[in-house]
Amino acid sequence: MATRNMIMVVPEEYGFNEHGLMTAVPNSVEEKSYLNLYMHHDGYPEWQGVQLANWRLANPTMDIARASAKLVRDMYYDSSYLYPSVNSIDHQYTYIVWVGKENNKISCFDRYNSKHIFTMTPNEIKTKYADDMDYTDFAKGETRCRRNNTIAKEELATYLSLIHI
């Protein structure tokens, strides 16, 4: 069974108080989210949490609109969809990628158990959850859909052979 998840991208000022403590849950920042990206598979922290940590380390600073667009580009695969609201579709895990001047944190919530799992920096997530898995190497330009340029070249060669070029 798929472990469905939703990724939100939210400005940091809506999630933390003046002491840097998180004060938000997904429903409280729903209207401030620039992105609600549904991912049908692998939502558990050991995969999606680490994937997002790796992505954030490769993309540490950018404005929120650009971060949202790039996250969709880099995370897209054939079972991912954009929704108008975090509550538009059933999913177990909700991730919030916080974007701002001071914050590089990611939060994870388990909706089925009404539980806050973590709010951590990317390195803290990797330390706690990384396992021996074939994570996407965003720092080397990989995306979830295209793991390396060799695949793209092989696909191109296949298409070209079909049209006899």
Q: Which residue stretches match the model-derived regions?
A:
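Extended, charged low-complexity segments
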Residues: T143, N148-I151, E155, Y159
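Short, solvent-exposed aromatic-acidic interface loops
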Residues: G20-W47, N113-S114
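Short, well-ordered loop/turn elements at secondary-structure boundaries
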Residues: M1-R4, E31-K32
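Short beta-strand scaffold segments in enzyme catalytic cores
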Residues: N5-V9
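Conserved small/polar residues in nucleotide/adenosyl-binding loops
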Residues: I163-I165
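Short acidic-glycine loop/turn motifs at beta-strand connectors
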Residues: V10-G15, V29-E31, W98-E102
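A basic- and aromatic-enriched beta-loop-alpha substructure that forms the phosphate/nucleotide-
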Residues: A69-F118, P122, D131
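Compact, glycine/acidic-enriched structural inserts
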Residues: Y44-S80
